[in-house]
UniProtKB/Swiss-Prot annotation:
GO terms for molecular function: ATP binding; ligase activity, forming carbon-nitrogen bonds; tRNA binding. The keyword DNA-binding does not apply. It is found in: Cytoplasm. GO terms for cellular component: cytoplasm. Catalyzes the formation of N(4)-acetylcytidine (ac(4)C) at the wobble position of elongator tRNA(Met), using acetate and ATP as substrates. First activates an acetate ion to form acetyladenylate (Ac-AMP) and then transfers the acetyl group to tRNA to form ac(4)C34. It comes from Streptococcus pyogenes serotype M3 (strain ATCC BAA-595 / MGAS315). GO terms for biological process: tRNA modification. PANTHER family: TRNA(MET) CYTIDINE ACETATE LIGASE (PTHR37825:SF1). This is tRNA(Met) cytidine acetate ligase.
Length: 368
């Protein structure tokens, strides 16, 4: 049986994600962000609810991306996720994209020219952000064109780079429905952005989200729930440069900006520059919120849930892979567990996120 990996956030899970799972082949393993997102946002609903939604709509296994993989720039996010999926035996990687191109060809380009491509990045002016530099790199070495807001396409390029030398088949699937950032409700396949924007429109949510009750009946989280915690961290931290990726310039800008900022958007707008993108600033503010220092990654793979078919696959891997199915007295990943504790502080109805939790099991799947 083909084993297909999918890297996802499901923030929240919606009909477009269900379409991706239905289109992908074979046994489907999801490497999913935990309670904080790649662009530096708290998850709308917690990782366990999102896992359950995925498993009820086509996923066979859901594993958690550690905090220091989940909250990273595209290249590191892709590299960490693909490394985990390779340990779980994937043969191909399926992903949605605005531009279906020959990503497999891009793997070969990077395998042959990685040194030259990396060297080229160092020649570009420091005023450019890292995403701008990487776009120029792909344009020069592979002739890849960029047309406005194409975040999934940009992630696809990172997947190609991270897949070099790994013998993975990339399977791009054309994104259907609304664009990534669209707030438009008039689509059967509405975007996650539109769903987050219109959470109070239950009729829209019920048509846009499979198993919509799981979304409607659980706490909806955003930076608004954590801004006071962040402000306290910034104002009372003796040395922000001890936080991951915070340099002297950013520390100074953040310390000044927090004194006049009433919410996260104002703070991000004040701190961001051409060099420091808004996404990067949000990630750094997330690092400050959870007091993240130098990154370390766990050896084990945390299993959030599986179907009967997924369980059969995991049994084959159990003796050769460090699979974590319950976090107890022995920790899995200290940083992720700390981030979970802070996430839980945002709302009294969020249950324990780490200690003692066991995988979600969906038993109504037939074994093939």
């Amino acid at each position: 049986m083909t084993v297909t990996g999918i890297i996802a956030e499901f923030n929240p899970f919606h009909n477009g994600h269900k379409y991706l799972l239905e289109t992908a082949e074979g046994l489907k393993i999801i490497a999913m962000s935990g309670n904080f997102m790649q662009r530096g946002e708290p998850a709308l609903i917690d990782k366990w609810i999102r896992s359950e939604m995925a498993l009820k709509n086509g996923a066979d296994i859901v594993v958690e991306l550690p905090f220091f993989v989940s909250v990273q720039s595209a290249d590191y996010f892709a590299q960490g996720a693909i490394d985990i999926l390779c340990q779980l035996g994937i043969q191909q990687l399926a992903f949605g994209t605005e531009n279906v191109i020959d990503y497999q060809k891009l793997i070969k380009v990077y395998e042959k020219k990685s040194e030259q491509m990396t060297a080229y990045l160092s020649t570009l002016e420091d005023t450019l952000s890292y995403p701008q530099k990487t776009q120029k790199m792909w344009e020069i070495f592979a002739g890849v064109k960029f047309s406005g807001q194409t975040p999934n396409h940009i992630l696809g390029l990172s997947y190609a780079k991270a897949s070099a030398g790994k013998h993975i088949q990339l399977c791009p699937i054309k994104r259907q429905g609304a664009a990534y950032h669209s707030k438009d409700k008039n689509h059967l396949l509405a975007s996650a952005s539109a769903i987050r924007q219109h959470l109070n429109d239950w009729d829209f949510i019920s048509h846009s989200v499979p198993n919509a009750g799981l979304l409607i009946n659980n706490p909806h989280m955003s930076w608004d729930h954590y801004f006071s915690f962040l402000k306290y961290q910034i104002l009372n931290h003796s040395d922000l440069t001890s936080i991951f990726q915070v340099n002297d310039e950013l520390a100074s800008r953040i310390k000044k900006a927090i004194k006049v900022s009433q919410n996260i958007d104002h703070l991000v707008d004040t701190v961001a520059t051409k060099r420091y993108t808004k996404a990067r600033v949000r990630r750094i503010l997330t690092y400050i919120l959870v007091n993240a220092k130098e990154p370390t990654l766990p050896k084990g793979i945390h299993i959030l849930g599986f179907t009967s078919k997924g369980q059969a696959h995991l049994k084959k891997l159990k003796k050769s892979r460090p699979l974590i199915t319950r976090i107890g007295a022995e920790t899995w990943d200290e940083m992720t567990q700390k981030a979970d504790s802070i996430y839980q502080l945002g709302h009294q109805d969020i249950p324990e996120q780490s200690f003692g939790r066991i995988p979600i099991i969906i038993k109504n799947e037939r074994l093939n």
